């Protein structure tokens, strides 16, 4: 499983969520987390139809989207996609 973490350096909610993402990285070492700066990788953001940040897209082993969360969320909301 993989999480695509769409963010920007200037985004306050993205910065606030950094601790939550780091916690998920520690608790689920088998899950890969790819951080995508929308200012530097705008084409990738467009390809995934990311309209606001932070956006977290959950992909299965085949690379298919199985979940999406937008905005600041509690860790439990993100974690439900990992079970």
Regions found by a protein language model. Give the residues of each.
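Short active-site neighborhood of thiol/selenol oxidoreductases, capturing the structured segment around
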Residues: 1-7
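Thiol-based oxidoreductase modules, predominantly thioredoxin-like and allied folds used
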Residues: 6, 25, 29-42
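The canonical Cys-X-X-Cys-His
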Residues: 11-14, 56
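Typically the conserved alpha-helix immediately C-terminal to a functionally engaged Cys/Sec
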Residues: 15-27
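Short loop/turn elements that flank and shape the SAM/SAH-binding pocket of Class I
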Residues: 41-43, 75-76
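Structural micro-motif
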Residues: 48-57
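Non-catalytic, surface beta->alpha helical segment in thiol-disulfide oxidoreductase systems
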Residues: 57-83
């Amino acid at each position: 499983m993989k999480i695509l973490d769409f963010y920007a350096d200037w985004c306050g909610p993205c910065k606030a969520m950094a601790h939550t993402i780091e916690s998920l990285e520690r608790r689920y070492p088998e899950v890969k987390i790819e951080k995508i700066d929308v200012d530097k990788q705008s084409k990738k953001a467009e390809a995934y139809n990311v309209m606001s940040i932070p956006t977290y897209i959950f992909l299965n082993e085949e690379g298919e989207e199985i979940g999406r969360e937008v905005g600041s969320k509690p860790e439990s909301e993100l974690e439900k996609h990992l079970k």
